[in-house]
Amino acid sequence: MFLVLERKMRTHQVFPLPLLLVIASVASENASTSRGCGLDLLPQYVSLCDLDAIWGIVVEAVAGAGALITLLLMLILLVRLPFIKDKERKRPVCLHFLFLLGTLGLFGLTFAFIIQMDETICSIRRFLWGVLFALCFSCLLSQAWRVRRLVRQGTSPASWQLVSLALCLMLVQVIIATEWLVLTVLRDTKPACAYEPMDFVMALIYDMVLLAITLAQSLFTLCGKFKRWKVNGAFILVTTFLSALIWVVWMTMYLFGNSLIKQGDAWSDPTLAITLAASGWVFVIFHAIPEIHYTLLPPLQENPPNYFDTSQPRMRETAFDEEMHLPRAYMENKAFSMDEHNAALRSAVGFSNGSLEQRSSSLGKKPSSLGNRPSAPFRSNVYQPTEMAVVLNGGTIPTAPPSHTGRHHW
């Protein structure tokens, strides 16, 4: 009996030992894992969920919301595309898609600056930063060229011209970024993450040139006789101006701010990530949404004036007559009545001559030397003056000469 009890006590003392080992291992893993992240998360993605470094979560949320809004705008533009009837508003649709694609790339690139660096991530950062900004600035420059033509001439370039200009301008930055990676990584066999901040900024000089040209071009969109397109030019001006301010701030912070606050490279990635998210939202709010809204508006229809509406001011009769060029039936009726009057006089003369011939023949006299005259017409063919003829003749009706009986035939 005592042996059985002793064996049970030994088994109860053995079972807690593995459980304690498991708890100790879990505690050690929790100590090494950041707060807010799971146990199986790779170390390079810790900044996406680390509650101790809250900047990563905030920038991640802002970039994710911007990406969703951009996708929604692309979907709306794609669905409403068949209903766009205005030719001038339909031409830049492809350019809008290209701009939204570049903006979506900026929001996606933000995540590459939140996670930890490795060779692949650094190559993506160095290549896509300049290329995506070049795409957005090229689309803005093409849009500024289009609005300038609309403001001055009322017509815009063709769709393929706008897209071709944007792609050709972006291709220059693609070549620059490719050469930078090839010369530093492949030829010199340096790590992709081993680059100085000044080298990163120098590789973006072409983007700065595009931004400056776009800002200057947008100023000319406010000068022209077609005023309804100046709103588009004003939004382009605001977008480029805010983008220029963002670039001045991030380059100052990236090149000089970290050394002044003695943080080393600790704030380099947050600075670049915040720049991408802020630039993307500026593009969405101040350019993409207004342009898509203006593109989807119904075409303007000029309604004819309601002449029975007493609330409208009266139009001048002289101006209305001069603008409409109404046909004047009065002159035509007057000419017609004058012809009728002449025909009546000729009939009266013919009737008098015929009466004289009859009287001379009854008296045995020879007819006069005036020749034969037509006889008097029947009463059914006698001229009957109209009301218009009476009005034009001053209210008097021409009468025929009296016959030999003394009565008028009319």
From Swiss-Prot:
Main location: membrane
Glycosylation site list: 30
GO cellular component term, pick one: cytoplasmic vesicle membrane
Subcellular location field: Cell membrane; Cytoplasmic vesicle membrane
InterPro entries linked to this entry: GPCR_3_C, RA-inducible_GPCR3
GO MF term (any one): G protein-coupled receptor activity
Low complexity bias: start-end ranges: 360-371
Membrane-topology descriptor: Multi-pass membrane protein
Record's keyword terms, sorted: Cell membrane, Cytoplasmic vesicle, G-protein coupled receptor, Glycoprotein, Membrane, Phosphoprotein, Receptor, Signal, Transducer, Transmembrane, Transmembrane helix
Bilayer-spanning residue ranges: 57-77, 95-115, 127-147, 165-185, 200-220, 235-255, 272-292
Annotated region (Disordered), positions in chain: 356-381
Stretches assigned to the Extracellular side: 29-56, 116-126, 186-199, 256-271
Modified residues (Phosphoserine): 355
Stated role: G-protein coupled receptor involved in the regulation of cell volume.
Family: Belongs to the G-protein coupled receptor 3 family.
Protein name: G-protein coupled receptor family C group 5 member B
Source organism of this protein record: Mus musculus
Gene name of this polypeptide: Gprc5b
